[in-house]
Amino acid sequence: MKTPRAWQRMLSGRRLDLLNPSPLDVEIEDIAHGLCFVARWNGQTDGEFPYSVAEHSLLVERIFTLVNPKSTAQWRLVALLHDAPEYVIGDMISPVKNAIGPHYSKLEDRLIEAIHIRFGLPALIPVKIKAQI
């Protein structure tokens, strides 16, 4: 049986394999561009403009830094990139994630690990840090 196509061509020209992502195929410009166009909560927010995942990511990093003023640049970057996989898989709401089951979480985990490695961050984040984000 032939393996289905599971990659996406990014604006940078990189080809990101969604099932086996390589840190070498992750570019910050692709992440920033993608997250700017992804609306939180499927666009179900009040206001004239959608609330983007990019804006949310900046807010989370800012709050994390305010709560943890002595945090390192490394942990602030982890906070900023906490939803980075959504640049290619979108901002799926939790009820849908739960309905899909563990396959979605595995996909998301592989993407965040590749993203972290690409930017010199630990692939796995300590529970204490993750809970603060």
Regions found by a protein language model. Give the residues of each.
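Metal-dependent phosphohydrolase cores
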Residues: 1-133
